[in-house]
Amino acid sequence: HLDKLPKEEGPLLLIAAGTGFSQAKAIAEDLLNQGTSRPVHVYWGARTVTGLYMADLPEQWSEDHENVHFSAVISEQNDWEGKQGLLYQAIVADIDDLSICQAVCCGSPNMVYATLDAMVDHGFRQDHMISDVFTIAPRDES
């Protein structure tokens, strides 16, 4: 997947909603096995904390690798003390300069396109995101 992105070394955002984490996990594990020094920000969103079915894994990555950062984002659980809201809200609040970032976005078509649009509105370059959604559910531009 990453070979489809422009050859740059800015921060990589692995953005996953729900079970989309399985794809982000595979990419993260591959990068870590290669010994990447590139900053990697893993954002995993779910409606409730139970949707983060293996949150201990990306937490461990961030403890073991100083270049890896993990943020869990919960949208529908008021007693959650971490980041709340939608994934793109957390991303635009956290990342000062989205123009230097690249992203892999894993989730439903609505989530992927909403995230892309919000990030572009904050300086992200559209051609710096890859997602299977762009192939399986292309946006109707008419």
Listing of model-derived features with the role each one plays in the protein:
Residues 5-8, 34-36, 97:
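Short, flexible hinge/linker loops that cap or flank conserved catalytic cores
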Residues 17-18:
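A short acidic Gly-Thr/Ser loop motif
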Residues 21-33:
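Histidine-anchored nucleotide/phosphate-binding helix
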Residues 30-35, 63-65:
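A broad, low-specificity signal for short, low-complexity segments enriched in glycine/proline
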Residues 6, 25-28, 91, 116:
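Short, flexible helix/strand-to-coil boundary loops that buttress conserved ligand/catalytic motifs
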Residues 39-142:
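Reductase modules of NAD(P)H-dependent flavoproteins
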Residues 1-14, 27-30, 48, 75-76, ...:
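FAD-binding FR-type
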